[in-house]
Every structure is written in C-alpha cells, then in structure tokens.
Regions:
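Short amphipathic beta-strand segments in non-cytosolic proteins
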Residues: 56, 68-81
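C-terminal motif of bacterial Sec signal peptides marking the signal peptidase cleavage site
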Residues: 16-19
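Beta-strand-rich structural segments
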Residues: 46-60, 106
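Edge beta-strands of extracellular beta-sandwich domains
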Residues: 115-123
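N-terminal edge beta-strand
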Residues: 27-47
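Bacterial signal peptide processing site
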Residues: 21-23
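Aromatic sugar-binding surface patches on proteins
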Residues: 86-91
Length: 124
C-alpha cells in the first residue's frame, strides 16, 4: 500500500512539474526575419560615443534573445554585447576609433537558432 502511495505521489509531482514549463516558444522562420540597425547620432563621428540599436521584423523577438554586434573595419572583428531595451530593440554603446565604412554583423540567438544579418555604418 505504501508503494502505491509513493508511486502516485511521484506521478503527481511529475505531472505538476511538466505543467510548469511555461508557454511553448513561437517558431521562427529564419527567412522571414529582417534586421535593421540605427545609430544615435544618425551620422557617427570617430572617437565620439555612439548608441547602436538593432531591431527585428518578421518574428516576435523578446528579452529571451541574445544579440551581439560584430563590428568590422578592414576585417578586424570587435564583438559588442547588447541589452534589451524593453521596446523590441537591443542597444549597445560604442566608440568608433577612426572614420570609415564599417560592416556590422547582427548576430541573433534565440533558443537553438542563430541568425546573422549584415548592416553598414559610415563614420565621419
């Protein structure tokens, strides 16, 4: 009789824990996701602070995602982590060392999905 109670108790615990998994993630179609990058100021100046903001369309991206900016001039990468801004965007501060045309690869990580989108920032 004690064994049956023990098995029943374990079964109830397993059922309760399986219900605590939260809402299932909404599937993301990688082909539908677009990324855009904006800067403040709109035209960055070398050696001055710049705030970059990455936003996404084609999928609902939340604070559960991670976004990294891969900034390159002459193929020299500099990785910058972003912070979710609460309004669907991810922001990071950066100082561009010199004028030029920088390639910025926006890396989006959601669960086991990794997407990379490319943008360009022209610095004066």
């Amino acid at each position: 009789m004690k064994v049956m109670r023990y098995i029943l108790l374990l079964s109830l615990i397993c059922i309760a824990l399986s219900g605590c998994g939260g809402e299932p993630a909404v599937p993301i179609d990688p082909a539908a996701v677009e990324a855009s990058l904006s800067t403040e100021p709109a035209v960055p100046v070398a050696e001055a602070p710049v705030t970059m903001r990455a936003t996404f369309s084609g999928a609902e991206i939340t604070d559960k995602a991670d976004v990294t900016l891969d900034i390159r001039l002459d193929d020299k990468p500099m990785l910058v982590n972003t912070t979710y801004d609460g309004e669907g965007g991810f922001t990071a501060g950066y100082n561009f060392e010199e004028p030029g045309s920088y390639e910025v690869f926006i890396h989006l990580y959601v669960d086991d999905l990794h997407l990379t989108k490319k943008a360009q920032v022209d610095v004066q």
